[in-house]
Amino acid sequence: MSRALLIVLDSVGIGGAPDAASYGDEGADTVGHIAASCARGAGDRAGLRQGPLRLPHLAALGLGLAAEAATGRMPPGLAPAGSVTGAWGHAVETARGKDTVSGHWEIAGVPVDFDWGRFPATEPSFPPELTQALIAEAGLPGILGDCHASGTAIIEELGAEQVRTGKPICYTSVDSVFQIAAHEEAFGLERLSAVCAVARRLCDPYRIGRVIARPFTGDARRGFVRTANRRDFATPPPSDTLLDRLVAAGRPVVSVGKIGDIFAHRSTGSEVKPAGNEACLDAALAAFAESGLGPGGLVFVNLVDFDTEYGHRRDVPGYAAALERFDARIPEIRAGLAPGDLCVITADHGNDPTWSGTDHTREQVPVLSFGPGLRPGPLGRRDTFADIGAALAAHLGLPPSCGRSWL
């Protein structure tokens, strides 16, 4: 029994799920379309990156092969140059949705078997009784927004009015979310968190997966930008996840990035929440290297920038550059694995930056598994993300639960 490192590349999907058409996402392919865009020069940006997508280490682990198995097409430049060094496959989500919470819970062995509540794409989006209760219980002068919106666009549109009136900006999307944006200094982080806590309780009867605090800074002259102090208020999982089972067995767990928020801080062990992909990966590798992470321990990290900074913003060059930066760190990840350790790299949904709109895309996800002594080769199609949690449970010496291990 040794340790495990689970890395979720937030939104790095590899092709439309079998039911993508019912979500309006037939043909979506995050990795494939980024690679194709880069191959024809559409991923170039002066001072950032140029040319074809270069992911030699991920390709060697089987990313291109997994994408080809999922879609029937090898993304340009992602065929492995030599022998494959990882066990690779692709997974299909059983939960109905394409959101962060459903994806992560299913990875951890708890597929969502109910429909999340969502707010309609009308204006207003929120039920009047919900809005009125939030205003009254949180002591607000009112709210702004009350619609479906892009988070970056709505703070540009309403940021100055938010500062002037003190009314927070409340908005949603096709996901099961209630998002609240307010100026970090004029409104205050503590007050924003308190308002979100009220909204979390009020949203429970509507089966809303997350209430998200979206602080921003800036002014009307310079523009407004979101800060790294985002906080998610998620509903807790309906049954025991892999994390619950590990903690119950006395195993060490380290949660990096927004993992603690996603699992409502239940059985998430030691939580570390740096800002950005690089800092989150640094923290995960540091935690994995510590002697305190003994046998049976898990480090679970989400790298959110792929989604928030590039997917939602439909930024192909930015997304490509972020993938290349992560790829360059694969040798470092490998070097941190001791004999018996296991690393799994996967994703929670797609967010194709070439797709219409600004929302997630319903996609299959890569499953890349490697470590000293692990035999490379195909894992095939995994019919649920829960197979990932099952494999980790088997590796960490826990009895089987939901899903089917490949180990």
Swiss-Prot record:
EC class name: isomerase
Pathway field: Carbohydrate degradation; 2-deoxy-D-ribose 1-phosphate degradation; D-glyceraldehyde 3-phosphate and acetaldehyde from 2-deoxy-alpha-D-ribose 1-phosphate: step 1/2
Cross-referenced InterPro entries: Alkaline_phosphatase_core_sf, DeoB, Metalloenzyme, Phosphopentomutase_DeoB_cap_sf
Residue intervals passing through the bilayer: none
Keyword hit for Ubl conjugation: no
GO function terms (MF aspect): magnesium ion binding; manganese ion binding; phosphopentomutase activity
Chief localization: cytoplasm
Free-text comment on the cofactor: Binds 2 manganese ions.
Cofactor dependence: Mn(2+)
Residue numbers binding Mn(2+) 1: D10, D348, H349
Catalytic activity: 2-deoxy-alpha-D-ribose 1-phosphate = 2-deoxy-D-ribose 5-phosphate; alpha-D-ribose 1-phosphate = D-ribose 5-phosphate
The entry's keywords: Cytoplasm, Isomerase, Manganese, Metal-binding
A cellular component term, taken from the record's GO annotations: cytosol
Highest rank taxon of the organism: Bacteria
CDD domains for this protein: PPM
E.C. no: 5.4.2.7
Biological process terms in GO annotation: 2-deoxyribose 1-phosphate catabolic process; 5-phosphoribose 1-diphosphate biosynthetic process; metabolic compound salvage; nucleotide metabolic process
Keyword Manganese part of the UniProt annotation: yes
Cellular localisation: Cytoplasm
List of residues binding Mn(2+) 2: D307, H312, H360
NCBIfam families assigned: deoB, PRK05362.1
Name by which UniProt lists this protein: Phosphopentomutase
Origin species: Methylobacterium nodulans (strain LMG 21967 / CNCM I-2342 / ORS 2060)
Lineage: Bacteria, Pseudomonadati, Pseudomonadota, Alphaproteobacteria, Hyphomicrobiales
